[in-house]
Amino acid sequence: ADNVIDVNYVKEMNKVFDSGYKVVTSYRNSKNYDTNWITAGYSLWFIREAKYLNNPRMMIKTSCAVSGTGYLVDSSIIKKNHGWKCNLLTEDIEFTVTNILDGEKVGYCGSAMFYDEQPTTFRQSWNQRMRWTKGFYQVLFKYGKDLFITMFKEKRMFVSCYDMIM
């Protein structure tokens, strides 16, 4: 485990958790952003993810998306599912989608930051992104129909379901 968290990470995550969210994701940052252009690119991607995806989602009270490992889960969700049920290549996306389909909104805490190490070579980055691409399609093929149906069946979940399909 190469992740590092800020000093107030747990305190900040608990604020969002205490506001009613059973799943809370945080600001993902690169531990080795200054190694080279590849790691710097990951940092820019994470800024985009935080500031232009999860932050606006939180502002309009739709579901955010878990990315990587920096998230909190209420034990009631694990108990309800009889353990961890997400096993696709992108289990973070699968976890987000299954929670949305179960009626849970994922919250976002931009003031809780965690850092993880990113690939440093083009080949490592390529292989990781190919895994992510395959994983995205696994999630789409497994849950796409349910997301589409729920999008129109449950009007309050339209934006969250649409967002995950896109």
Give residue spans per PLM region:
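The conserved acidic donor/metal-binding loop of glycosyltransferases
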Residues: 1-4, 87
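Residue-level signature of catalytic and energy-coupling elements of molecular machines
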Residues: 2, 24, 99
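Short, non-transmembrane cytosolic segments of multipass membrane proteins
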Residues: 2-3, 102, 109-134
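Long helical/loop segments within the catalytic core of UDP-sugar-dependent glycosyltransferases
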Residues: 7-86, 130, 137, 141
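Basic/Trp-rich segment in TM-proximal cytosolic loops or flexible interdomain/linker regions
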Residues: 60, 120-166
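Catalytic donor-sugar/metal-binding loop of nucleotide-sugar-dependent glycosyltransferases
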Residues: 61, 87, 96-115
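Short, hydrophobic alpha-helical packing/hinge segments within bilobed ligand-binding/sensory domains
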Residues: 95-96, 125
